[in-house]
């Protein structure tokens, strides 16, 4: 608990595939995954595991409705708190409709970095023992990347965080697993 792992490596070495297996999206071709002596499949599917895929889903709904897909009963205060965490609260407050801002088909009304942070906020609304994040910093400027990274490390104080990123944060609080192609 409280562990943060950064999976690094060149394109095509299997970082995202590894996360897909851990998230239960793909079955391993061989071998078994175990966590604390139990088959990893025993943990899936579960509300204890949150997965941010490389391709995020933003729906033609309001910001609030998109966020509440992560926790249906979340009140507006919880939504504003999670938007603060992912550095989107100022943007949302600047919108004429605030939380009721429509995001458009496939999130057309927001940038790629904003879409990733909305999807991340959706995951963070519900406490989870394991967060699997594929490229959570994509499309973010350096300052936002560092702020989101620091927040994730703080949030994971009681859980496990596994991140795949081509733009790793400057902080050294991640253990690093570097994947390489077979020679």
Question: What are these regions, as identified by a protein language model?
Answer:
Residues 56-74, 138, 170-171:
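Conserved catalytic motifs of ABC-family nucleotide-binding domains
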Residues 125-129, 158:
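A short, proline-enriched helix->beta-strand linker immediately N-terminal to the Walker B motif
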Residues 118-126:
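Hydrophobic/aromatic position at a conserved helix-loop-beta junction
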Residues 8-10:
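The feature captures the beta-strand-to-loop junction immediately N-terminal to the Walker
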Residues 64-104, 150:
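ABC ATPase nucleotide-binding domain helical subdomain, centered on the C-loop/LSGGQ "ABC signature"
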Residues 31-45:
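Conserved ABC transporter NBD signature motif
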Residues 23:
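Helix-to-loop junction immediately C-terminal to a conserved catalytic motif
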């Amino acid at each position: 608990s409280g562990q943060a792992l950064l999976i690094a490596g060149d394109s095509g070495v299997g970082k995202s595939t590894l996360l897909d297996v851990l998230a239960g999206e793909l079955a391993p071709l061989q071998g078994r995954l175990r966590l604390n002596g139990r088959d990893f499949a025993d943990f899936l599917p579960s509300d204890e595991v949150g997965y941010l895929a490389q391709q995020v889903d933003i729906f033609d709904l309001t910001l609030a409705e998109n966020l509440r897909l992560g926790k249906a009963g979340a009140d507006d205060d919880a939504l504003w708190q999670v938007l603060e965490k992912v550095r989107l609260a100022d943007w949302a407050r600047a919108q004429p409709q605030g939380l009721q801002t429509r995001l458009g088909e496939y999130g057309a009304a927001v940038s790629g970095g904003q879409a990733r942070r909305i999807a991340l906020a959706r995951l963070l609304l519900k406490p989870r023992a394991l967060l699997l994040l594929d490229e959570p910093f994509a499309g973010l400027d350096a300052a936002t990347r560092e702020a989101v990274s620091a927040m994730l490390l703080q949030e994971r104080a009681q859980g496990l965080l596994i991140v795949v990123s081509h733009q790793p944060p400057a902080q050294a609080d991640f253990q690093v697993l570097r994947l390489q192609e077979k020679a």
